[in-house]
């Protein structure tokens, strides 16, 4: 007998640009000891942050206006090609937020998105000498309830400061159909 695997309504995926969001810095972060929703983040620690900075192999990576739009287009391309439903995306200067419905793992989505974005950035020749653009992993949250999906989309689109490169799927019909399909 085959075991049914529960698929969440969507995933909330966040990843940062290389060297911009270091453990111990003033910006909150998670690590292996601080990764349970609702618990404390990594505390600010100047020594830990300085140690992380020393380990960087190149300068921190920031996305300018043109690069953010290249990344957004690459994300839409990847989602279309893989038949994933992109519900929301916000490409910031130093991090990316996505809300995606898919039947694969959020880690697979994140890795694919990073690959597509890097490929398109390489083709643009805006920063082709970079070795590293993205942090090694990121945050992957499972959204099981419609309310959680809507709240997360609101956060991604409207609660990040001034809009940068954004996408919001206004049509939830395609999403609803995908959710109830076997």
Language-model segment annotations:
Residues 1-182:
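Short catalytic/metal-binding and nucleic-acid-binding patches
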């Amino acid at each position: 007998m085959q075991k049914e695997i529960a698929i969440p309504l969507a995933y909330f995926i966040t990843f940062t640009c290389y060297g911009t969001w270091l453990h111990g810095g003033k910006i909150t972060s998670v690590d292996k000891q601080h990764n349970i929703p609702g618990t404390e983040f990594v505390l600010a620690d100047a020594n830990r942050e300085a140690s992380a900075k020393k380990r960087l192999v190149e300068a921190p990576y920031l996305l300018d206006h043109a690069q953010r739009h290249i990344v957004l287009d690459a994300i839409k391309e990847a989602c279309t090609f893989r038949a994933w439903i992109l519900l929301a995306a916000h490409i910031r200067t130093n991090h990316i937020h996505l809300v995606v419905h898919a039947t694969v793992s959020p880690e697979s989505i994140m890795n694919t998105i990073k690959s597509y974005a890097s490929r398109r950035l390489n083709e643009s020749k805006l920063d082709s000498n970079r070795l590293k653009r993205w942090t090694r992993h990121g945050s992957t949250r499972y959204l099981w309830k419609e309310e959680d999906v809507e709240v997360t989309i609101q956060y991604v689109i409207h609660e990040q400061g001034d809009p940068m490169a954004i996408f919001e799927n206004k049509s939830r019909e395609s999403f609803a159909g995908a959710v109830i399909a076997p």
